[in-house]
């Protein structure tokens, strides 16, 4: 059983390394040997579909898919147990339908993939049913634990029997499922989309993982309207992962993990300490400065909070800082990551909005620096008021030694940005280069990274990627419903009726995102609302590069605000303190962040000037 439990991890880790090698070969073939590989990109995308699906399966087993629990946490224990049982039942149905639709799309696939020697696209579509069967097995494993620990009323045997019965019906009497077509009984017309959206909100807020709730709502819509087109729509579940720009996401995740395991994080922190530690509020400045440097390599807010957080909080405690400020600064400074290039959030926005990722990278730099300086100013004020001690000023020799040890790590952002703008590699390939560079530094320079650690890091990155992959798949499916019913256009018409200028629209959008960010995870929020907000921005002639940076900053504020502020929970965990302590500490640091948001909203040129200058 031990080896079976590791099946996805070993297979996914091996495929992850295979993609890594293929894309490194692609860069070398083009830049060194001047002979591009025509098959590498297509093969990498095909393997990524499997990596993403295997990651979803791992997250099902560990029950790590993104969900909203603030309402269920308020429920009495018996009601919460009943609600959790309902949630598990809905997830079970989703996985069964993944298998069902996966088989149908696999059988219908016939086109060749020319870049891979004409092999059938069935190889891509096979990922959905094959891995979904594995998901079902993992789901039943998880339910065994849930029943034993009293989290569910339904034992695993119930789901096993249900699965056997449903598969028997599927293979021997598939027409029986036609009774589930609501359109056979009720004709709701254009109201169907509103029913689907209402159901989506209800099941999402009772704890159904966000990705699965999107899938259920969309299927409900199709059952009320156009079930005959559902097969074509479900093809998008797989095609949504068959995207080259999305390959950057898992490799920036991997880079952040490798920085922690390869000794890079500690050296970045020590350099920031030698540079800033002797000023008033020095250790707070070190915390913020280290986050700026770290963000230039990992591109993730929570990677910063989790990777640097423990190190930063310990150093601040040792220097005499109160826990609330230790936690508050650590949480607040982590939002620099998604703004300063490279940025996972910017990559996702670029894919959704079909905008230049290189431009987005550059556009986020100035706001990132502004927030860094603003947080340092607030830290200085608090440190002076509370009388925190300074650390002794480092000597020139100590500063040089610290710089020498961290030099190769600090070089990473310059390598990434320089490579993109020199044309050596694309923004997607920059993630591969960053990960490869982290391997080289960790293995051969700092000598703290082993091959076993590298493989385990790939497995961890694959598992995190699975959470993102489910969101990408189901939000694309959900987007088909939104597009068919022109929901984005309807929302835009409401904005047009209320707003009289682009600034008014931006204020309304900021207010909406700030409110939603209190309850919905930033990643989920990005996938859910951007497809509806981007058309509104276009209708008011708002620059989409500016819009991407503004919405990214806004959503990052969401990870700092309760009750769903993920950074608060991560920092509380790594710092061994209560969430309320972190929340208390982060409140004063929200002021400079809000001021920066207002500033860039009123003066978008702060964001657009540099990218327009460098990339006409």
Swiss-Prot record:
Coarse class of the protein's main subcellular location: membrane
Coiled coil: none
Protein name: Sialic acid TRAP transporter permease protein SiaT
Disruption phenotype: Cells lacking this gene are incapable of transporting sialic acid and thus unable to sialylate its LOS, making the organism unable to survive when exposed to human serum and causing reduced viability in biofilm growth.
Gene source species: Haemophilus influenzae
Classification via InterPro entries: DctM, DctQ, TRAP_DctM
Intracellular or extracellular location(s): Cell inner membrane
Keywords on record: Cell inner membrane, Cell membrane, Membrane, Sugar transport, Transmembrane, Transmembrane helix, Transport
Pfam families xrefs: DctM, DctQ
Subunit structure: The complex comprises the extracytoplasmic solute receptor protein SiaP, and the fused transmembrane protein SiaT.
GO molecular function terms attached to this record: transmembrane transporter activity
Family: In the N-terminal section; belongs to the TRAP transporter small permease family.
Keyword hit for Transmembrane helix: yes
Residue ranges of the region described as TRAP transporter large permease: 191-616
Protein task: Part of the tripartite ATP-independent periplasmic (TRAP) transport system SiaPT involved in the uptake of sialic acid (N-acetyl-beta-neuraminate). N-Acetylneuraminate can then be incorporated into the lipooligosaccharides (LOS) as a terminal non-reducing sugar, protecting the bacterium from complement-mediated killing by normal human serum.
Membrane topology of this protein: Multi-pass membrane protein
Note, other: Is essential for lipooligosaccharides (LOS) sialylation and serum resistance.
Domain of life: Bacteria
